């Protein structure tokens, strides 16, 4: 499946606050993410708590041990809504 991507302002705000090393690691992981956001290397999984809050299925993908990107699907469009530590959805 070919995916389209869109990022919210909140995502870019959070991305800009990340240390340079995490930004670099995120860019590397996005190369995989853009091919398939559900690639097994990313450990993408549903987040029940956020899904209930947003009224749609919300997912998180692991960039590194304590860095996640939070997103949802809108048809074939992947909408990234935030990036940060695991605390984003705890």
List the model feature ranges, each with a label.
Residues 32-61:
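A short, surface-exposed loop/turn module that caps and links secondary-structure elements
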């Amino acid at each position: 499946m070919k995916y389209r991507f869109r990022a919210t302002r909140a995502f870019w705000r959070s991305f800009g606050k990340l240390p340079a090393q995490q930004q670099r690691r995120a860019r590397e992981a996005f190369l995989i993410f853009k091919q398939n956001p559900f690639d097994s290397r990313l450990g993408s999984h549903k987040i029940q708590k956020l899904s209930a809050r947003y009224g749609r299925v919300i997912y998180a993908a692991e960039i590194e041990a304590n860095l996640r990107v939070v997103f949802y699907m809108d048809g074939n469009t992947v909408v990234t809504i935030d990036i940060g530590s695991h605390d984003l959805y705890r």
